[in-house]
Swiss-Prot record:
Subunit structure: P0 forms a pentameric complex by interaction with dimers of P1 and P2.
A molecular-function term among this protein's GO annotations: large ribosomal subunit rRNA binding
Gene3D superfamilies: 3.30.70.1730, 3.90.105.20
Designated name of the protein: Large ribosomal subunit protein uL10
Protein's organism: Trypanosoma cruzi
Role according to the record: Ribosomal protein P0 is the functional equivalent of E.coli protein L10.
Region span, Disordered: 298-323
């Protein structure tokens, strides 16, 4: 059996080897994770990465010595400073070293997610809701529900829950009454797994909430931003690569509309045929609408100008209109 110092030396060599070989480090929470889960995760990570556990004090010393070495890179120094500042090497955590994309690793971890009952003293990792419906329990069991303020009624000789009731929120500690009731209802509400808390990716630290941002989400936000900028530029009349085609098309529609309204023909861009098609109603899309609007506006102008003449006729009668 190797001595303690020899075991530490071998562990340090393995840890340093992982830091050299892999560019990504996943810091994972191991609370309530069973040894069999760890074994299964390690098995499925073969060829993808390595899961390393151990004492945090030893891991800190290894990272510190690596950063203080004369041959230490800026990457090694930054990793050490980040581990100390963000307290990454604390608590019940494990490290997964990999060069694979993060979703590949999280898919392996999610595969070994285990359902578990709510035990007394456990911290709820999620909200727990007892659903409405018949429980199949005898009326004498109503005391369990009353202790948790769950509305019930007796239906066909059994206890029936009137409406859904939240009995635990995230972070709550499971008490004896809640654990007993959930056990009687055969509800195992908790799920435990190796859970990624943060990722060190070649000099950058990503927190848990950042991991939900995928390439598809980034593309969606980027397209929305481009669309908003294009709409703003178009409304302000500022030519950009995105708005210039629309501005040219709008100007051409206006020109064609003016051609239809004033009987002016232009040879460029097949203007004569387009004008003829607009007059015959064979021109589709916004161009026809613009031409029709211009034609309607031109026809309405003489009618508007004729209105004062009717008022002049009334004025000719003078007082005679009273008789």
């Amino acid at each position: 059996m190797p001595s303690v110092s020899e075991a530490k030396r071998e562990y340090e060599e393995r840890f340093n080897g992982c830091l050299t070989k892999y560019g990504r480090v996943l810091f994972c929470l191991m609370d309530n994770v069973r040894s069999q889960q760890v074994h299964d995760v390690r098995r499925d990570l073969r060829g993808l990465g390595e899961l390393v556990m151990g004492k945090k004090t030893l891991q800190k010393k290894i990272v510190e010595r690596r950063a203080e070495d004369k041959k230490a890179s800026a990457y090694d120094k930054l990793l050490y400073n980040t581990c100390i500042e963000k307290k990454l090497l604390c608590g019940n955590t494990a490290l997964i070293f990999t060069n694979e994309e993060i979703p590949v690793i999280t898919a392996v971890l999610d595969k070994h997610r285990v359902q578990a009952p709510a035990r007394v003293g456990a911290i709820a990792p999620c909200d727990v809701i007892v659903p409405a419906g018949n429980t199949g329990m005898e009326p004498k069991a109503t005391s369990f529900f009353q202790a948790l303020n769950i509305a019930t009624k007796i239906a066909k000789g059994t206890v029936e829950i009137v409406s859904d009731k939240k009995v635990l929120s995230v972070g709550d500690r499971v008490d004896n009454s809640t654990a007993t009731l959930l056990q009687k209802l055969d509800i195992s509400p908790f799920y435990y797994q190796v859970e990624v808390q943060s990722v060190w990716d070649r000099g950058m630290l990503f927190l848990r909430e950042d991991l939900s941002i995928t390439d598809d989400v980034v593309e969606k936000y980027l397209l929305e931003g481009i669309s908003n900028v294009a709409a703003l530029s178009l409304g302000a009349g500022i030519p950009t690569a995105a708005t210039l085609p629309h501005m040219i098309m709008d100007a051409f529609k206006t020109l064609l509309g003016a051609s239809v309204a004033t009987e002016y023909e232009f040879d460029e861009f097949d203007g004569k045929n387009l004008r003829k098609a607009a007059l015959e109603g064979n021109l589709g899309g916004g161009v026809a609408d613009a031409a029709a609007a211009a034609d309607t506006g031109a026809a309405a102008a003489p009618a508007a100008a004729a209105e004062p003449e009717e008022e002049d006729d009334d004025d000719d009668f003078g007082m005679g209109a009273l008789f």
